[in-house]
Amino acid sequence: MEDSSLSSGVDVDKGFAIAFVVLLFLFLIVMIFRCAKLVKNPYKASSTTTEPSLS
């Protein structure tokens, strides 16, 4: 009985680690796409951020 509870605890920890890594990869992919948009068209990206302060 105690062995099964110990192994399930290890599986929960492994699940949290895998979920954390997956979330990190998703965040990395989102940042890559945002940076690619900025590199592709920097003037449009900068004009949308500075537009409210100019008006």
Curated annotation (Swiss-Prot):
Keyword annotations from UniProtKB, A to Z: Membrane, Transmembrane, Transmembrane helix
Topology class, membrane: Single-pass membrane protein
Signal peptide: none
Pfam families xrefs: Cortexin
Localization per Swiss-Prot or TrEMBL: Membrane
Alphabetized InterPro entries for the sequence: Cortexin (IPR020066)
GO CC terms, sorted: membrane
Major location (coarse): membrane
Bilayer-crossing regions: 16-36
Top-level taxon in the UniProt lineage: Eukaryota
Protein name, per record: Cortexin domain containing 2
